[in-house]
Amino acid sequence: MLSGMRPTGSLHLGNYYGALKNWTELQYQYDCYFFVADYHALTTGYEDVSHIEDHTHQMVIDWLAAGLNPAVATLFVQSRVPEHAELHLLLSMITPLGWLERVPSYKDQQEQLKEKDLATYGFLGYPLLQSADILLYRPMGVPVGEDQVAHVEITREIARRFNFVFGREPDFEAKAERAIKNLGSKNAAIYRGLRRSYQEQGDAAALTRAHALLDGNSRLTLADHERLLGYLEGTGRTILPEPDALLTATPKVTGLDGRKMSKSYGNTIGLREDPDEVAKKLRTMQTDPARVRRTDPGDPEKCPVWDLHKLYSAPDVQAWAANGCRTAGIGCLECKKPLIDRVVEEITGMRQRAQEYEDNPEQVRGIIAEGCEKARGVASETLDDVKQAMGLTYR
């Protein structure tokens, strides 16, 4: 299992409930590798690198304070495992440009970050670097939310293409071409067109149609049927296994202004923020606009505070808050009181655990060094297999 985060600043409750909390559970179920994606931080923040070292160090402290256990999970820094960059380079030789341009987040981030110069190869190629990050450890799965499934899918396509190009049996292509002729001239032409659409454009509908074409053809032997499926999908000897996207429940973490909690919106509560500041932020957090006066009833579903109640409050407290809101039986500040207590309690625990590591920076560096060494051991084995398949081993 593998996942990572970009070190772009202090972590907040959105990061914790969106990923970290899930990681703390997964580490006891799988062999997990969690990395600080400092190369990825450069794709949108290369103009100022003055804080990247400190952000990386502080991110690892946040992880440890949140409950990641270096005794069971491997924590490391991406740039300290050079195999990431080398596999990225090698995979770039076989990745069609169009595959990178059609990743949904490519255009989305260009729109969202118009003030930044994103006309760089690094930004265009970050999904490929992400694929290299994943494939290097040959994980069975990658924990993601719904919005990240496309990133895992392009990783699967790249692995499939690599296995197709470099993992085929001797004379695989010649045997596949002979099998295509056995389809008959009309079906052979259709198959070639569908194969081209899928491999060059990632057309999933073409893949489905090609499967149906092969399944419905009685001229093929079983061996040729399987061979043409491999020729179509780009499979062969599996050097880089295709990882699954493991959809994980990621609860909505609402920011102080009612939007998704995000550093870019300036609406966050930091994992190690001062408790008094946290309480102040929550007391002034937006509520249901219908509650102008204390006696005005409201609707919890229209109140950003309610989303946090669902994360933090026990069922009886949620029922009290919802009923009090709808009937105007309680005011907004009264509603926030038990929530503030719970959030401050959690933040205080994070701060205390983090302080132990702040006071022992050498311990943190040791955890990182040990994790990097272990990660390199696994990564180098994969890279050796990749280079051997590509003919890049020399005496």
Where are these regions (language model features)?
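Conserved nucleotide- and phosphate/pyrophosphate-binding catalytic cores
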Residues: 13, 150, 156-395
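A short coil-to-beta-strand element that immediately follows conserved catalytic motifs
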Residues: 73-75, 138, 243-245
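N-terminal Rossmann-like or analogous alpha/beta NTP/dinucleotide-binding catalytic cores
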Residues: 2, 7-132, 153, 157-159, ...
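Flexible, glycine/proline-enriched loop segments at strand-loop-helix junctions
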Residues: 109-116, 138-149, 267-269
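Active-site glycine-centered loops adjacent to acidic/histidine catalytic or metal-binding residues
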Residues: 133, 147, 258
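Membrane-embedded alpha-helical core segments of multi-pass
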Residues: 129-130, 136-137, 163
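Short helix-capping/linker segments at secondary-structure and domain boundaries
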Residues: 97-101, 136-143, 313-321, 351
